[in-house]
């Protein structure tokens, strides 16, 4: 099993990266938050989990052991595959996932594309007692997302496409991107696709937390 990677970062995309290890370029999928810690041409390291199927070997990378641990517990739930588990961690911090399961917070889980009320309840029941909160502060926990739309620009399509790859419909993704840009116009001015993707996913998660508490 490949438990971790450490080497020179060769490439970073919106949903994957390549790290050179011993003369080989190893590609892995990861959340935008994890990818934001990697920079091309510089040393980088990730914790990993290898998914073996009959027709493919897929490697997933994580910023730390905690993120990987939550991923590995999530994929043991019936109906939660690696792609959905990665989508959950793209929207929510690992500690938020732990709290949602422990506190039976279905609304937080349903902010993730592909998870409806029934699936959220199923995840909570199956993982009960296996994802205890650590008490770690959740970055950006006090932020709130705006629902006001903004004007679409061509470069937003890259963000929409990346979110579609995580399971959102294009309509849902575009609405989320517009709301984030409306709340923080400076993201639109910077035209940093990765930064906008991370902010949008964070806002999607926080919107669920805010509404769930009402």
From Swiss-Prot:
Pfam families named in the record: HHH_5 (PF14520), RuvA_C (PF07499), RuvA_N (PF01330)
Region (Domain I): 1-63
Location of region: Domain II: 64-142
Span list, region Flexible linker: 143-151
Organism domain of life: Bacteria
GO molecular function (one): four-way junction helicase activity
GO CC aspect terms: cytoplasm; Holliday junction helicase complex; Holliday junction resolvase complex
Record-linked NCBIfam families: ruvA
Full protein name: Holliday junction branch migration complex subunit RuvA
Species: Micrococcus luteus (strain ATCC 4698 / DSM 20030 / JCM 1464 / CCM 169 / CCUG 5858 / IAM 1056 / NBRC 3333 / NCIMB 9278 / NCTC 2665 / VKM Ac-2230) (Micrococcus lysodeikticus)
Gene: ruvA
